[in-house]
């Protein structure tokens, strides 16, 4: 029996009957020989961590554009916090931690530069149905490894596709909107817990809002400190979830659901749409819009940038189609977009 097979047997012996054991994965688009040491989901997690897209998350916006402070979240730190929260919930419920972690680490790989402002630009210039979750699937399926993709398992791909959607329903009842595995559904909740808590923490740290402005009901239920918010929401999910009519349901109590909606509404009205944040996103949208048009009309510049970003199977021959330019823009970090915009559109002193 290999080390991998021992892991798989341990999962079968320990995990909840509602968990997704590695040995029962539906597999990959392109079949591969199994690893003698790692399970399928462990391999997926490792492939994501070693991907270019994952490394680029460190220079992509969470809420505040290119923050100068050392303690503000980036898209990478957000991803790591989601993974930690999701693993904690999965462990408490005897779900597959490796699958949970892989989905959590991959859920934002397709996020645009400048956060959701960048996503709005690509909706307008490329296609109204563009979303960072769909772009994350493109990243792992056909952009990473110079067009080869990461060839992840069906379960991880499904979880990435079904993670939370901004101002949408926290836990929709429609089966088509939630992941097919309990692990994927845990990541959806963990994503929301993470951004509600850390976006509020960053907003208070930056001075965009004060502690006194936070709805008193939210403070009473969740606590004042960042760690109190996270712990309270995690415990509520763990204690509220469980078996119902022969099926496991991932949910929070009605009281917690209402508080989370109240806090999310507060963040949208007072942080995400605050003038100091919105005005910077307006500038970011201008940068990405002009870069999009520039690369659509400059083949050589597009191919050079695609080579730098290590996109496509043959970036030196790639055509600047709308899809390809969208892939290029979405792959950029805030820093790359800013420096490239400056190089292209700002005059260079001759002497």
Curated annotation (Swiss-Prot):
One GO molecular-function entry? triphosphoric monoester hydrolase activity
Q: Which UniProt keywords apply?
A: Hydrolase
Q: Which SMART domains match?
A: HDc
Domain spans labelled HD: 75-196
Superkingdom, taxonomy of origin: Bacteria
PROSITE patterns cross-referenced by the UniProt entry: HD
Q: Which Gene3D superfamilies match?
A: Hypothetical protein af1432
SUPFAM superfamilies assigned = HD-domain/PDEase-like
NCBIfam families referenced in this protein's UniProt entry, alphabetically: dGTP_triPase, PRK01286.1-2
Which family is annotated?
Belongs to the dGTPase family. Type 2 subfamily.
PANTHER family this protein is in? Answer: BIS(5'-NUCLEOSYL)-TETRAPHOSPHATASE, SYMMETRICAL (PTHR35795:SF1), SLR1885 PROTEIN (PTHR35795)
Q: What is this protein called?
A: Deoxyguanosinetriphosphate triphosphohydrolase-like protein
Species for this entry: Desulfatibacillum aliphaticivorans
Its lineage reads: Bacteria, Pseudomonadati, Thermodesulfobacteriota, Desulfobacteria, Desulfobacterales
């Amino acid at each position: 029996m290999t080390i991998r097979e021992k892991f798989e047997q341990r999962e079968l012996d320990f995990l909840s009957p509602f968990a997704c054991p590695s040995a029962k994965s539906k597999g990959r688009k392109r079949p591969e020989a199994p690893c003698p040491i790692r399970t399928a989901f462990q391999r997926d997690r490792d492939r994501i961590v070693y991907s270019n897209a994952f490394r680029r998350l460190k220079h992509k916006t969470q809420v505040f554009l290119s923050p100068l402070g050392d303690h503000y979240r980036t898209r990478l730190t957000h991803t790591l916090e989601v993974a930690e929260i999701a693993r904690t919930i999965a462990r408490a419920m005897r779900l597959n931690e490796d699958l949970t972690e892989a989905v959590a680490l991959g859920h934002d790989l397709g996020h645009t530069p400048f956060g959701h402002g960048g996503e709005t630009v690509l909706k307008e210039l490329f296609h109204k149905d563009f979303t960072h979750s769909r772009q994350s699937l493109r990243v792992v399926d056909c952009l990473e490894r110079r067009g080869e993709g990461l060839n992840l398992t069906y379960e991880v791909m499904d979880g990435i596709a079904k993670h939370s959607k901004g101002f949408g329903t926290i836990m929709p009842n429609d089966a088509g909107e939630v992941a097919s595995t309990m692990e994927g559904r845990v990541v959806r909740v963990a994503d929301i817990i993470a951004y509600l808590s850390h976006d509020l923490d960053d907003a208070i740290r930056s001075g965009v809002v004060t502690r006194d402005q936070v709805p008193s009901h939210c403070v009473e239920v969740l606590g004042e400190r960042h760690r109190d918010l996270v712990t309270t929401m995690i415990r509520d999910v763990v204690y509220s979830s469980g078996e119902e009519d022969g099926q496991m349901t991932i949910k929070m109590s009605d009281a917690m659901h209402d508080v989370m909606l109240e806090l999310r509404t507060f963040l949208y009205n007072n942080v995400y749409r605050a003038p100091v944040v919105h005005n910077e996103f307006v500038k970011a949208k201008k940068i990405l819009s002009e870069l999009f048009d520039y690369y659509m009309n400059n083949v050589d510049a597009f191919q050079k940038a695609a080579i730098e970003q290590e996109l496509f199977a043959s970036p030196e021959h790639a055509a600047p189609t709308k899809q390809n330019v969208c892939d290029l823009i979405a792959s950029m970090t805030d820093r790359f977009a800013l420096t490239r915009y400056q190089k292209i559109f700002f005059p260079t002193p001759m002497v």
